[in-house]
Design a protein with these regions (language model features):
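Acidic, low-complexity intrinsically disordered regions
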Residues: 1-261
């Protein structure tokens, strides 16, 4: 493995709290509940390959990882990228879906309202995750905060409800996102399939330039993480999201669409 190029952040916070010297925090929210379920292994392999490549270049990254399938979630928070828990275990999403279905069969009364009203709006679950990270950030001393934070959302959910009865309405989510962008300098990235990702992103306060629609096939799922890895390296070094970060994702989508026409 090549020597990591990341500089150690000598501020007291991260060096003393977890020994990672982390300067950049990456918050991944990965949802697999719809058409991408057939490509679970590609998502996991693509994500793990990205983490492995990032490790070769930088050791100063912290990873939050939220995995969701069938409204069942698992997560790790503030994991140094060098630790095994920054990776996803094979079969993770299948396990979550199975647990969710078992709970649903045992407690059907809890899902009546969701089935009739809520739909499958992925971003409402995202709101809770962002709020959790926000609370950690706000309660930390300034020297205990990362220099940069990026929130990366990858979903195959195709329905965004505006009248759901859920706390996280689009307006509330947009307020939360814009607050973190303005007050803390966070960057948000949104990748979605079978939806207009740029429009959905803008509806909740994420800049369209930080969003892309991807092809729901094995190559498209893997390309997400190949492109994200390159973009993350640039962001961790400069704090800038390059405008062309999603070019290969969009090119593959266009190729698959032209093949179907």
């Amino acid at each position: 493995m090549a020597e990591a190029k990341g500089k150690t952040d000598t501020r007291r916070g991260y060096f003393d709290v977890d020994g990672s010297g982390a300067m950049t925090e990456l918050i991944f929210m990965l949802e697999l509940s719809g058409p991408m379920a057939a490509f679970e292994s590609d998502l996991i392999d693509g994500f793990n390959d990205m983490i492995a490549r990032l490790r070769e270049e930088r050791s100063d990254l912290l990873v939050w990882l939220y995995e969701e399938a069938g409204k069942c979630m698992d997560f790790n928070t503030r994991v140094p990228i060098t630790e095994d828990s920054a990776l996803i275990e094979q079969g993770c999403f299948t396990r979550l879906s199975t647990l969710a279905e078992e709970y649903r069969r045992a407690h059907p009364e809890e899902f009546i309202h969701q089935d009739n009203v809520r739909g499958s709006g992925c971003l409402f679950d995202v709101g809770g995750c962002i709020h959790m990270a926000q609370q950690v950030y706000q309660t930390a001393l300034p020297e205990d905060r990362p220099m940069r934070t990026m929130v990366i959302i990858v979903t195959d959910n195709t329905k965004i409800e505006s009248e759901s009865g859920d706390y996280w309405t689009p307006d509330r989510l947009r307020e939360l996102v814009e607050q973190q962008e303005k007050e803390a300098g966070w960057e948000f990235v949104f990748l979605g399939t079978s939806i207009n990702a740029k429009q959905v992103a803008e509806d909740v306060g994420i800049p369209a330039k930080n969003a892309a629609t991807f092809a729901c096939d094995a190559a498209g799922v893997r390309e997400n993480f190949a492109s994200l890895g390159v973009m993350i390296l640039e962001f961790s070094a400069t704090g800038v999201v390059v405008p062309t970060w999603a070019q290969k994702i969009s090119e593959h989508l266009a190729k698959t669409q032209s093949g179907r026409s």
